[in-house]
Amino acid sequence: MALVKSKPTSPGRRFVVKTKDARLHQGGPYEPLVVQKSKTGGRNSNGRITTRHRGGGHKQRYRQIDFKRNKTGVPGKVERLEYDPNRSANIALVLYQDGERRYIIAPRGVEPGSPIQSGRDAAIKPGNALPLRNIPVGTQVHCVELKPGKGAQLARSAGAGVQVVARESGMATLRLRSGEMRRVPADCMATVGEVGNAEHSLRNLGKAGAKRHLGVRPTVRGVAMNPVDHPHGGGEGRTAGGRHPVSPWGMPTKGHKTRKNKRTDKYIVRRRKR
C-alpha cells in the first residue's frame, strides 16, 4: 500500500492524495457473487428525501460479502484481493477446498495465498473467524456479530478493530475504537485481526467532482438558506443563526445525544467519548 500525490498541474489535482495497492486484482469481480444495485438518490418508496446529500455517482454493483463466516471446518485460501466500490475496506475472494468461493472483508496482513478458516478450532491468525469465547482476551478482532448467527455488524470499515478485554458468564466485553465498552454474547463470531486498507483515511479527493463520482451531493449551511428551509435561515446580511445549532427539523445538534435504543443500554458498560 502506498500513498500517491499528484503534481499540481491544475487546481483540481493540486491536493489529490490517492492510495495505490499493487496486490489488488486488476480485472472484474467474481460474477456469481455480484448482484445489481439500483440507486435511490436518498429517497424512500414515497419519493421523499430520507437521507440528504445523496444522488448521482458512478454505477456500482454489489459484492455479496460473507459476514456470517459459517463455513466451519472447511479450509480455504485467499485467491485474490479486490477493490469494492461499496465500502472503504478491500475484499478478499476465498476459495474453499470444496470448490465454493466467498468474499470476506480483507484483514490487514492477509495476502493472496494466505490460509483462511472458520470455526471453534481455527488458529488465532488474521482472517480466521471464531466465536468470541474461543478468542484470547487482549486480541484485536473485527467483523463482530451482535447476535449469534446474524452476521457481522461491528468494525467493518477500513482500519477498524475491536479489542476483547474480558469474558465472563457467557458474555464478552469489547473495547471499540470510539472508546465505548460493550458486552456481546460470547457465541458471536468475530474475525481475528484488524481490517486492512487503513491508509484510506489519509486520502484527499482534491475536488468536488471526485465526491460527486461517489454519489455525494453538496452540503448547504443552514445560515445560507431561507427561513422556510432551515431554522438558521434568513436575516439581513450575514448572520450567525441566532440560536444554538439545530438540524433542519429543529433538533439540537453538535453534541446533543440522540441514542434512543434503551432496550440495549444494559449491554453498554461505558459510553463512547464525546
Swiss-Prot record:
GO terms for molecular function: rRNA binding; structural constituent of ribosome; transferase activity. It comes from Halorhodospira halophila (strain DSM 244 / SL1). GO terms for cellular component: large ribosomal subunit. PANTHER family: LARGE RIBOSOMAL SUBUNIT PROTEIN UL2M, RIBOSOMAL PROTEIN L2. One of the primary rRNA binding proteins. Required for association of the 30S and 50S subunits to form the 70S ribosome, for tRNA binding and peptide bond formation. It has been suggested to have peptidyltransferase activity; this is somewhat controversial. Makes several contacts with the 16S rRNA in the 70S ribosome. PROSITE patterns: RIBOSOMAL_L2. Residues 50-61, 254-274 have a biased composition (Basic residues). Residues 36-61, 223-274 are annotated as: Disordered. GO terms for biological process: cytoplasmic translation. InterPro entries: NA-bd_OB-fold, Rib_uL2_dom2, Ribosomal_uL2, Ribosomal_uL2_bac/org-type, Ribosomal_uL2_C, Ribosomal_uL2_CS, Ribosomal_uL2_dom3, Ribosomal_uL2_RNA-bd_dom. Part of the 50S ribosomal subunit. Forms a bridge to the 30S subunit in the 70S ribosome. This is Large ribosomal subunit protein uL2. Pfam families: Ribosomal_L2 (PF00181), Ribosomal_L2_C (PF03947). The gene is rplB. Keywords: Ribonucleoprotein, Ribosomal protein, RNA-binding, rRNA-binding. Belongs to the universal ribosomal protein uL2 family. HAMAP family: Ribosomal_uL2_B. Residues 37-46 have a biased composition (Polar residues). It comes from the Bacteria.
